[in-house]
């Protein structure tokens, strides 16, 4: 049986790791062991942060909606409650886009939410010391 030499596979394995580590600083892009550790960590970070990105965007959308809703005399939670009672099914991403790029359309949605809310609960509560 022929003897199997592993130099080709070893060089390919090292080359792939060093190609993935291109752009890293210092030894992490030049030395195989350091590059392998950094590439492994980078893949872990990428996996984790692809999932974290969803929550970050949701928080950003909520902040934008809240700011625009308060400018129209309603708080975020009252706006969402009013839209739910009115039967408007618009997700937070679209609401945030409307708040930024289409303020008139967003204002009409706020008015729809205000009319759907029960009486005397549509005004936001203002802090006493503000």
Curated annotation (Swiss-Prot):
> Matching SUPFAM superfamilies, A to Z?
Ribosomal protein L20
What Pfam families does the annotation carry? Ribosomal_L20
Keywords of the record: Ribonucleoprotein, Ribosomal protein, RNA-binding, rRNA-binding
Quote one Gene Ontology molecular function term. structural constituent of ribosome
Tell me a GO cellular component.
Answer: ribonucleoprotein complex
InterPro entries tied to this protein? Ribosomal_bL20, RIBOSOMAL_L20_CS, Ribosomal_protein_bL20_C
Q: What GO biological process, any one, is recorded here?
A: ribosomal large subunit assembly
What role is this protein assigned?
Binds directly to 23S ribosomal RNA and is necessary for the in vitro assembly process of the 50S ribosomal subunit. It is not involved in the protein synthesizing functions of that subunit.
Q: Per the similarity annotation, which family is this?
A: Belongs to the bacterial ribosomal protein bL20 family.
Protein's recorded name: Large ribosomal subunit protein bL20
In its UniProt entry, the species of origin is given as Clavibacter sepedonicus (Clavibacter michiganensis subsp. sepedonicus)
